[in-house]
Amino acid sequence: IYGRDYVSIFGAGTSNSEFEAMTGNTIKFFPRGSSVYQQFMHESTFALPGYLKKLGYRCEAIHPSSGANWNRTASYKSMGFDQFLTIDDFKNPEYVRYISDKESYKKVIERYKNKKEGQPLFVFDMTIQNHGGYLTNTNWKDPVYPEGSHLPEAKEFLSATKVSDDAFQYLVKYFEKQDEPTIICM
């Protein structure tokens, strides 16, 4: 199954895209420049985690950065997440610019392995490895050089994307070996 996800932001304001994905609502009707998590998420908000909890799911969020960023800790709670794992929950992680996508996916697998038997699990993992900007000083193991490009930022972006693709393959291969039906939505 595949489709398109149209987002209302570009280049900043990740939390607004998260809000739209988790609630099914648009930020179009909020004031221009709003940060929904910081300005409007004060009470319980109808969202996918709250709905899934009513169906018996345990709902967890992972973001390997500070929970204070964009007021995620409070916002995730208002959406119904049972637990929110932040940078503090990663012990000696691998870094690729930031905490690597593979480390974040290892945390997803850890949560799956440790879940209560028979209880369905929803994990929302907001990775951070490829967060902008695209400085050009990373020492890549296998750099990707765009043919004909003289922009070092392109090499940085594409090299980071390749490492992310490899990490995503690691996650998919793990769940392909599990008997329990699993949906990975990227």
Where are these predicted regions, by residue range?
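Solvent-exposed soluble domains appended to multi-pass membrane proteins
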Residues: 1-186
